[in-house]
Amino acid sequence: MRAYYALLSQQEGADSLSQFNHPGNTFGTFGDFAFWDPVIDSRMYMVEAGNGEGQIGAGGYYPSYEYYTMALDKGWHLAPTNNQDNHKGRWGNANDARDVILTDDFSEEGIYDALRAMRMYATEDKNLEIGYTVNGMLLGSSLTEVPEKLDIHVTVNDPDASDSISKVEVIVNSGKTAYTWDDPAVLATGDLSVTLDPDYSYYYIRVTQGDGDLAVTAPVWVGETLKLGISDVTCGTSTPVTGEKMTVTTTLFNSESTDARIKSITYAVGSQVLTSATDAGTVPASGTLDPVSYTHLRAHETEA
C-alpha cells in the first residue's frame, strides 16, 4: 500500500478515483487501513461494504460492513459500495446489490463529480431509495464547524409491495447505534427525523429490510475525525460448541496524538449484557491496547 499511496500522492493522481476493494480476512484489510494521510485520504473515495456475484446471503457474496466502519474509524473519508467483482458473466445483474449515486447530471463528468462528493449509498436491494441529510447537508458532506445540534432527516422507500423496511439506524463511531427507528407505523411514512447532539465524528444510515437485505449510506462527518476505535474482535475457538468456553478478544487502536482512556467496555449478545467493565485501561497515542479478553460459556455471537 505504501507504494500505491506514493504513486497516488503525485500530481498525476489528483484527479483519480480509488476504492478499497473487498476488505476482509480472505483478501486482506490494507494493513487495517493503515498509513492514513490527508493527501491520500482526499484521493480515496470508496470502500466495498459488499462484494461478489453470488446471491445475497449465499455463497459467492462477501459482506464486509464492519470494515467500512473500521476504515471510517481510522480517519478515511469514504463512501460505501456493493459490487460484484464478477468473473462469470451477467455483469451488473447477477444479484440485486447496487451502488446508488445521487446526481441530477448523468453526464460522465456529472457522475464523477457525485462520486468525488461521495453522494452514494450501497444496497443489497436493487431499487431501495434512500435520502439522507444532516442540517440540510447531503450524505458525503463534512460539517467542519461543529454545530450545537444535528438535525437528521432520512427518507426511505422500496417501491416493491413485497418489500418492507424493518429498521433504520443512525450509526456512529465504532459502529455504535446512536438512534433507531423501528416502529412500523413511523417507518411506513418513509419520512424520518431526529435531533441529536454532535458527540461523534461521523454519522451514516443503515437500513434493514424485512427480508434481511441491508443498505448503508455515506456518512456526514462532523468536525475533525477522531481516529480511534476497535481494530479487531476474534474468537479463540475456530468452531465454538455450545456448553464449552469461548474466549473473545478485542484489540483497540488509537491513532491520535494523545492517550485515550477507556471509560467502559461491554460484551453483549443482542440486548443481553454479558459483562461490562469501567476504567478498562488506556490506549497509548499512536498505539494499541493489549487485547482485552472475555470468556463466554456458551456459543453465541458476541458484540463488543
Mark where each language-model region is:
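Proline-enriched interdomain boundary motifs that mark the N-terminal boundary
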Residues: I130, K227-V233
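Short acidic/proline- and small/hydrophobic-mixed sequence motifs that coincide with surface turns
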Residues: D163-S166, V241, S257-I262
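Short, solvent-exposed loop/turn segments enriched in Ser/Thr/Gly
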Residues: G243-T249
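Short acidic, flexible loop segments centered on an aromatic residue
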Residues: A260-Q272
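Intrinsically disordered, low-complexity Pro/Gly/Ser/Thr-rich segments with frequent PxxP/GP/PP motifs
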Residues: L274-Y294
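Conserved small/polar residues in nucleotide/adenosyl-binding loops
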Residues: T295-T302
